[in-house]
Design a protein with these regions (language model features):
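Helix-loop-beta hinge of the Bergerat
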Residues: 1-29, 107-120
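Phenylalanine-focused residue identity feature
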Residues: 3, 9, 39-42, 84, ...
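Conserved aromatic-histidine-acidic binding/catalytic patches
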Residues: 5, 9, 30-34, 133, ...
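Short amphipathic alpha-helical segments
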Residues: 13, 17, 34-41, 137, ...
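Conserved short strand/loop->alpha-helix "switch" segment adjacent to the catalytic nucleotide/phosphoryl-transfer site
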Residues: 21-43, 127-132
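Amphipathic alpha-helical interaction segments
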Residues: 28, 32, 49-57
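Conserved polar catalytic motif of the HATPase_c/GHKL fold
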Residues: 44, 48
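Conserved beta-strand-loop-beta-strand hairpin that lines the nucleotide-binding pocket
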Residues: 52-176
Length: 176
């Protein structure tokens, strides 16, 4: 494991974590393309936690900060040696599970060429904000992660101790 963090995600935390990861990647014996992809994927995953982690405040209380976990590591097994992995986990609203599953299932079925074409199409999509009210960006985060990954993204949802069952724990894994 090169990096692990669990807790509140803020812009300052992401910047500090990015600096730490950069330093650790600098000492790795990997090509610059692999390091760039790991760093880019890390930033996208951290931004996803920051922007999409479900947090519930009691009525009249301020919204709590986004929380989650992110880890970066390198495979040591002979067949996978040199490959990096990144895992991110955060709570999501249960009503978003179907939407996330649809997006991730579609990404898993795409070839790299199809992912790149979808990315280029999305870059030109000036109506994204009108068509996807839940997305806080240009809709490029998961496409960026999938584009940089060497295998289809893995994902799962798990129950949380939320007594009202409003959230689930979302996990996504990318291999670089």
């Amino acid at each position: 494991v090169l990096f692990y963090y669990a807790g509140e995600f803020t812009p300052a935390m992401i910047a500090a974590a990015a600096d730490t990861l950069k330093g650790r990647l600098a000492s790795e014996e990997a090509g610059s393309a692999a390091k760039r992809k790991v760093f880019s994927t890390f930033i996208e995953m951290a931004q996803n936690v920051l922007h999409y982690a479900a947090a519930h405040a009691e009525p009249g209380q301020p919204q709590p900060p986004a929380s989650g976990a992110i880890a970066v590591g390198r495979d040591a097994s002979e067949g996978d040696a040199g490959h990096y992995w990144l895992v991110c986990s955060n709570p999501v609203h249960v009503e978003h599970i179907a939407r996330l599953t649809e997006k991730l299932s579609a990404l898993r079925a795409m070839s790299l060429a199809e992912i790149k074409e979808s990315y280029r199409t999305q870059l030109r999509n000036s109506e994204h904000a009108d068509n996807d009210a839940l997305s806080k960006g240009a809709g490029l985060g998961l496409l960026t992660i999938a584009r940089d990954a060497s295998a289809p993204l893995e994902y799962s949802f798990a129950s949380t101790p939320d007594p009202q069952a409003r959230t689930a724990l979302f996990h996504v894994k990318a291999r670089i």
